[in-house]
Structure formats: structure tokens, C-alpha cells
Amino acid sequence: MMKQEITIQIPEGLEARPVALLVQVASQYGSEIYVESDSKKVNAKSIMGMMTLGLFAGETVTVSADGEDEEEAIANIEKFLSSK
């Protein structure tokens, strides 16, 4: 299992379109991937779960992945969340 703290730099935060794109990125991997903010932890492959977090630019989340491609998964999710 691998964990990484990532600061969201997408200007509009995680609204519907960026969430859909993030779910597409996460769904490319076989690993179990979760995003955690405060006390909420949701499956990164779930649009509804991700929408419940209501994340904004500048917020920091913890992304965890467990599986054969966990390193690549976290690296690409970090790249996506850090894009401006």
C-alpha cells in the first residue's frame, strides 16, 4: 500500500467535470484507490463518492493505492490534481 498527500491545484476544484476526469484516470488501474479528506474516505473510481468530498483548489487530500500498479496510479493522480 502506498499513500501520498496531494494539494489540489485545479483552479475550479473538483467539480463535476474534473471529478469525471479523475475517475477516468483512477479507473485505468487495477489497484484499489481511495481519496481521503478530513474524516471522509471514498473510492477514487466512484463519481458519486468523489462528488461528496466537495474539494476546492488549495485543499490537501491523501491518496492511497493498493495493488500491482499503485505507484503509477498515485503518480498519475498527483499529476492530474496538480495541473493548473
Predicted regions and their residues:
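Generic alpha-helical hydrophobic packing signal
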Residues: 3-7, 20, 26, 76, ...
